[in-house]
Amino acid sequence: QTNETQRERSSYMYSMRDGDLNRSMTQNNNQRVCDNICRGLSKLPHFNEDMERTFRQGLGVPGAIDAGINWYRANIPPVDAITDEDFWPGKHASTSVPSLLIWGDADLTFVSEFIDDLAGYAENLRVHHLPEVGHSPMLEQPVEVNAVIRHFLATGAG
């Protein structure tokens, strides 16, 4: 609510729910979404025709992206209307469960201050930073991400 940069970065969540952006995303079996994702992934050295075909097959099914859009509709009220009751499970909730966040430093979806603040909510948090990686580290650096997860699990996840 209070971080203006994050508000700007999150504005897509509101515009994709309805209206022109929603229609352009979902028309022609989500073609725009498929094109945008594949265009971004095509820059990766390990992205190949088989992977593109798989993405297009999965994302090209009518309704394939509806669940994500509906999640935004159901769970994120307009910023100016957010109240303490909108926070789930609660505004000051925390966990002691060992937690791992794999964070791409080039992620344009979330501001880095959010990552710094997570320690206040997850007391047993491990953050693994990936330089020059964006919002989808599991797609951009799958070998390293899998190694980090394996190490986290092998060391008692904490």
Predicted segment positions?
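Alpha/beta-hydrolase-fold serine-hydrolase catalytic core, especially in secreted/extracellular enzymes
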Residues: 143, 155-158
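Catalytic histidine-centered segment of alpha/beta-hydrolase-like enzymes
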Residues: 133-142, 146
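Flexible "cap/lid" subdomain of the alpha/beta-hydrolase fold that forms the substrate-access gate
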Residues: 1-125, 129, 150, 156
